[in-house]
């Protein structure tokens, strides 16, 4: 059984760009509701199918499988809700933890989110200076919700 434990934060500034090279990710959702999602993702010429369950606090079940990239691209094109999410991901280590910063493109341009995966829900970690407010529990910032409610329509 896979379990994902993560926190999400708004990013201010672009200092993260000096820490890693951005990799283009394209992902789409075959199915999603408030409790679960099935997505396809393509990056680095590889395809992935991911199933995620209901969030409980900052954790949820997650299962991910590599699939042929050609099939992943076809699923993105023909079976996923539109628009497909496109983003540049910057992945790096900071104070012993892996951070991922997603700089969204297209309908969600202007949104930059940082995520940290944790070993358990009580893990203590240090944040880089450019990390802003936490949005872990805010459903607007779920990638699946950004398909139907893009960042350009947010009223902060």
From Swiss-Prot:
Keywords assigned: ATP-binding, Hydrolase, Nucleotide-binding
Impact when changing residue 4 to A: Partial loss of ATPase activity and strong loss of inorganic triphosphatase activity
Effect upon mutating residue 8 to A: 16-fold increase in ATPase activity and strong loss of inorganic triphosphatase activity
Position of the signal peptide: none
Effect of substituting residue 39 to A: Strong loss of ATPase and inorganic triphosphatase activities
EC id: 3.6.1.25
Domain CYTH residue range list: 2-148
Active site: 29
Stated pH dependence: Optimum pH is between 8 and 8.5 for ATPase activity and between 9 and 9.5 for PPPase activity. Hydrolysis of ATP declines sharply as the pH is increased to 9.5 or decreased to below 7.0.
Consequence of changing residue 87 to A: Strong loss of ATPase and inorganic triphosphatase activities
InterPro entries xrefs: CYTH-like_dom_sf, CYTH_domain, NeuTTM/CthTTM-like
Protein transport among keywords: no
GO molecular function, one term: ATP binding
Pfam families: CYTH (PF01928)
SMART domains named among the record's database cross-references: CYTH
Catalytic reaction(s) noted: triphosphate + H2O = phosphate + diphosphate; ATP + H2O = ADP + phosphate + H(+)
Keyword ATP-binding: yes
Role according to the record: Involved in the hydrolysis of the beta-gamma-phosphoanhydride linkage of triphosphate-containing substrates (inorganic or nucleoside-linked). Catalyzes vigorously the hydrolysis of inorganic triphosphate (PPPi), however it can also catalyze the hydrolysis of ATP to ADP and phosphate. It can use ribonucleotides such as GTP, CTP, or UTP and deoxynucleotides such as dATP, dGTP, dCTP, and dTTP.
Assembly behavior: Homodimer.
Record's protein name: Inorganic triphosphatase
Organism: Acetivibrio thermocellus (strain ATCC 27405 / DSM 1237 / JCM 9322 / NBRC 103400 / NCIMB 10682 / NRRL B-4536 / VPI 7372)
